[in-house]
């Protein structure tokens, strides 16, 4: 605070001199002229927007706060079928004695939830997961091990 000047003495500036400064008594005011604007078709005015809003051709179903129950039902059935497929494969290929029915049902529900989450947040990964799961099931059906399908000629030697 050393750069500020602080004093208890009254100011030497006369306030009356500050207020009564000489002002010119006559001020010239120019008349207001309307602004000329050119028509730009890329800019929507309220009149143009009213025409578009009232036209049913431009109404879309893009409200974020409405639910399409038909789409929800369709997706629920899709994921339940996928979960049942995973549960069927677990029951049929893992064996009836190794897992009980409760574990197999939980595996199917978990698979349905995983596919639903992947579809919402990453559709590309969901597609890859489905193909990967199908490929893995198919190779195990035929007794193929993908690591040794090509034999040692396809594997680079470790030095």
Swiss-Prot record:
One of its GO terms (cellular component) is membrane. The keyword Membrane applies. It is found in: Membrane. Its main location: membrane. It comes from the Viruses. The chain crosses the membrane at residues 76-96, 104-124, 131-151. It is a multi-pass membrane protein. Keywords: Membrane, Transmembrane, Transmembrane helix. This is Uncharacterized protein L434. It comes from Acanthamoeba polyphaga mimivirus (APMV).
